């Protein structure tokens, strides 16, 4: 394989935010989750929204298969669902990130962490999660995946972000919203401090 | 009834739940309907015990009869203790022609020639399996009925399942089996478990197997859970492929309920060659023992593979459990399938 | 899955944003444990002051605790498996009043046990004997002295002259606690954050509620985190050239239905070789040659060690252990379980282990 071919291949596998035209009064959200556990529940709740047509695409990881390229609508928001009890879950999301066009990081990516309150989550992993989100200027949401209430509130938050990202909210843009909601890390995350 | 008989009966009563005990007595042909109905299983075990003792004494029944009862009980509740599988090898021409009566006679006579004091009882179970109860003694002591060995053999198959056998008794059993069946050797099948039915089904391949095929199997459709036209799985093909491979390796539907699998690895260190050059270049094996445990091991493995926790295609080490019907493996550098390197 | 539910339950019981304890000054309300605030609903908490596990550890080889600590006390410490809890600083606890505490706690336990029972008064008074004692030599420079508590009792139907038996024991310790943190405590507080107990659980909860009532502290279960377990695996393996560790056993649990448990037991010499190969800037031989006491171990080395073990496993079984969680680590030097049970079988390595656990306890405190 020639170098030229390789670059084409990589280019094709990148998911781009503006390569397709948007559909009328519709928004498409891509849920990426290694475990494929929470995404189905979340998807069922998301499509229940009555104000706009919500399309949900589910994936285990990126890149997305080429075969679906044609039928796939423009994706307005990419959500990485990360189960903090699993190291693999975070590693897999990190690996998927490189298949996103940089344009997505202007407000069209968000992280949704589950099980953050579980005692088996090492603080180091939570730190790594926060650093990742902060370095990419993305919002980091925490969700409870075991209860209907938790699913509903996660759905509501995602819908709010999604509608803005899809350009359905006249007064806001994705970039504007993300500058308000993006994850920040405290300056002393790495060193112990006693004031 | 003597003290020993009492102890034996007491142990049987104590170990068996009331309902199972009732079922066991129902299967025992010696009891009359009236006798059977007279036992009240709702009362405490001590009282049940006394009632049974009375019945036994009334009929003049002894240890022999209690062991009969114990055997029926064991056959109905085979999932206790640890069962080990053996496989007989080198069949003679008449291996498939051995009949039950012939086997019974020969086995009994061979074993009593080998061991001075031994008590053997053989019974045919409803599923055609032969159940053998052996109480071992030696030159000085009578057969110990408190620690019997149970052997299950399906005639016309090379498989034998054994529980509670110690290493001293093993050569005698092996000898008697070889002499009374049409085989010339016997080897450890490296398969053990608490459920006799599970290890039998695994060895005899009596579970729903999925074979590799070019065409999509019905499994693929099963996996597609299209709940809503607005929800689309991008990688549904990958998912169904994973499920297909998981089922090929570990079976479909209800799988034999194994509890453990053990691997003794004596292979070279196989970490990441880039990050750990010292170790990968090191001479000699990296010795470790890996034990997998679950209430249903094959089901756990199947989910590992279908959910992607285990990469597909499934590691030959794991698929060997069903393929070879084993759950104990010693893996050395030579024995390792080449795809691993 | 069931396990996770339980753990979540325990996490929810833990106050998240700090318990309002008026007596305490602001200065240390901002310190330890506020990392729990990280679990708040949003990824940004402006006032978050994070306190993390140390990323390096000094392994001093000269812990001759045998010479310092009373032999009977040491024998007890290494004999039992201890269930761990964390304890917030004790208000007005005095090491000089241990005798009076012994009396008070005996009375408390007896009274609680007696509730609703009509028993012979003379007998009851003797039925629980509590003794508090100091464990000399088990503390770092800034730490408060370790306290050992033992409860003796007789069987209900024991004869008069039969001696009382030890039925419960526990200890409170602080081993090399962060000196900045200890220094920030007001004068009336004593910090003994790590509580170990061994014996019937009803007694454990009685002792704990007595502490809560008398010293205005919070006590809660302490898990040994994934990271701590990985640290212990490395720290223990690091001792193999001095004391044979016999084996390195790691128990993992994978989240599938039904749950899959994997016990990974590595030959001690091979584990040691792997450990040597991940030590920075040194092959296995070099580490062995160096005899200087007090070596620094870095978290990166611990992680590469675990990574090495996991990738060897993956190459054979194509199963990724990192999708699950580490539940237990054991060698002949001791064993540690995620549910907060620890056994330290060799006194030589007690200090290192307790230092790690003290750090974990300080992190867990909901201040």
What are these regions (language model features)?
Chain A
Residues 72-73:
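A short, aliphatic-rich alpha-helical micro-motif
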Residues 50-55, 127-131:
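WD40-like beta-propeller blades
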């Amino acid at each position: 394989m020639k170098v030229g071919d390789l670059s084409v291949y990589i280019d094709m596998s990148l998911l781009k935010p503006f390569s397709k035209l948007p559909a009328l009064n519709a928004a498409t959200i891509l849920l990426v989750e290694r475990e494929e556990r929470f995404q189905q529940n979340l998807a069922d709740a998301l499509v229940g929204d009555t104000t706009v047509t919500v399309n949900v695409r589910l994936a285990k990881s990126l890149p997305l298969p080429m075969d679906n390229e044609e039928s796939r609508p423009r994706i307005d928001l990419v959500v990485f669902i990360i189960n903090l009890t699993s190291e693999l879950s975070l590693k897999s999301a990190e690996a998927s990130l490189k298949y996103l066009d940089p344009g997505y990081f202007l407000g069209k990516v968000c992280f949704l962490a589950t099980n953050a309150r579980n005692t088996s989550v090492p603080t180091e992993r939570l730190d790594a999660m926060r650093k990742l989100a902060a370095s990419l200027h993305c919002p980091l949401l925490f969700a409870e995946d075991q209860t209907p209430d938790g699913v509903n509130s996660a759905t509501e938050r995602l819908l709010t972000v999604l509608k803005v990202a899809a350009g359905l909210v006249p007064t806001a843009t994705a970039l504007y919203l993300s500058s308000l909601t993006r994850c920040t890390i405290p300056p002393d995350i790495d060193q112990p401090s006693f004031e | 009834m003597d003290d020993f008989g009492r102890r034996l009966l007491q142990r049987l009563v104590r170990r068996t739940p009331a309902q199972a005990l009732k079922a066991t007595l129902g299967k025992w042909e010696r009891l009359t309907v009236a006798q059977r109905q007279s036992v009240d299983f709702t009362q405490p075990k001590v009282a049940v015990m006394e009632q049974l003792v009375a019945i036994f004494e009334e009929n003049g029944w002894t240890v022999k009869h209690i062991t009969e009862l114990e055997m029926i009980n064991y056959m109905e509740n085979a999932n206790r203790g640890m069962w080990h599988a053996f496989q007989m090898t080198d069949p003679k021409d008449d291996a498939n022609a051995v009949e039950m009566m012939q086997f019974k006679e020969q086995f009994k006579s061979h074993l009593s020639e080998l061991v001075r004091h031994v008590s053997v009882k053989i019974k045919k179970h409803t599923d055609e399996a032969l159940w053998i109860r052996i109480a071992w003694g030696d030159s000085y002591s009578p057969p110990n009925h408190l620690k019997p060995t149970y052997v299950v053999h399906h005639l016309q198959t090379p498989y034998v399942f054994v529980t509670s056998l110690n290493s001293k008794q093993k050569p005698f059993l092996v000898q008697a089996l070889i002499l009374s069946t049409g085989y010339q050797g016997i080897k450890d099948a490296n398969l053990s478990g608490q459920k006799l039915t599970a290890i039998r089904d695994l060895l005899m391949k009596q579970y729903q197997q999925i074979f590799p095929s070019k065409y999509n199997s019905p499994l693929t459709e099963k996996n597609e859970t299209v709940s809503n036209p607005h929800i689309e799985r991008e990688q549904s093909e990958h998912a169904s492929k994973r499920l297909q491979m998981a089922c090929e390796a570990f079976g479909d539907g209800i799988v034999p309920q194994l509890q453990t699998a053990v691997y003794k690895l004596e292979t070279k260190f196989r970490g990441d060659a880039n990050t750990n050059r010292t170790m990968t270049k090191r001479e000699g094996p990296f010795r470790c023992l890996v034990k997998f445990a679950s209430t249903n091991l094959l089901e756990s493995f199947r989910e590992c593979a279908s959910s992607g926790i285990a990469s597909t295609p499934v590691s030959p080490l794991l698929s060997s459990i069903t393929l070879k019907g084993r759950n104990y493996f010693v893996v050395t550098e030579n024995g390792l399938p080449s795809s691993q390197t | 899955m069931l396990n996770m539910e339980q753990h979540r339950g325990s996490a929810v019981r833990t106050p998240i944003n700090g318990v309002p304890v008026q007596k305490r000054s602001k200065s240390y309300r901002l310190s330890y444990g506020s990392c729990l605030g990280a679990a708040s609903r949003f990824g940004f908490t402006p006032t978050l002051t994070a306190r993390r596990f140390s990323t390096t550890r000094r392994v001093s080889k000269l812990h001759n605790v045998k010479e310092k600590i009373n032999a009977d006390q040491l024998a007890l410490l290494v004999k039992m498996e201890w269930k761990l809890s964390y304890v917030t600083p004790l208000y007005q606890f005095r090491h000089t009043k241990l005798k009076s505490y012994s009396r008070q706690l005996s009375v408390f336990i007896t009274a609680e046990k007696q509730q609703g029972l009509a028993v012979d008064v003379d007998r009851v008074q003797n039925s629980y004997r509590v003794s508090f004692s100091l464990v000399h030599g088990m503390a770092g420079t800034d730490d408060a002295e370790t306290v050992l508590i033992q409860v003796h009792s007789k069987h209900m139907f024991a004869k008069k002259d039969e001696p009382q038996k030890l039925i419960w024991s526990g200890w409170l310790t602080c081993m090399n606690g962060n000196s900045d943190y200890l220094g920030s405590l007001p004068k009336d507080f004593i910090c003994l954050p790590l509580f170990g107990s061994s014996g019937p659980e009803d007694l454990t909860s009685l002792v704990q509620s007595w502490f809560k009532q008398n010293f205005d502290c919070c006590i809660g279960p302490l898990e040994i985190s994934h990271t701590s377990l990985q640290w212990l695996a490395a720290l223990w393996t690091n001792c193999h050239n001095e004391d044979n560790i016999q084996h390195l056993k790691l128990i993992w649990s994978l989240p599938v239905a039904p749950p899959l448990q994997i016990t990974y037991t590595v030959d001690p010499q091979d584990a040691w070789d792997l450990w040597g190969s991940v030590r920075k800037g040194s092959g296995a031989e070099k580490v062995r040659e160096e005899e200087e006491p007090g070596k620094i171990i870095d978290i990166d080395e611990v992680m590469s060690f675990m990574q090495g073990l996991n990738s060897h496993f993956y190459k054979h079984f194509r199963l990724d252990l990192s999708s699950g969680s580490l539940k237990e680590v054991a060698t002949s030097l001791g064993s540690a379980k995620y549910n907060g049970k620890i056994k330290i079988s060799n006194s030589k390595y007690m200090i290192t282990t307790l230092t790690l656990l003290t750090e974990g306890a300080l992190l867990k405190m909901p201040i």
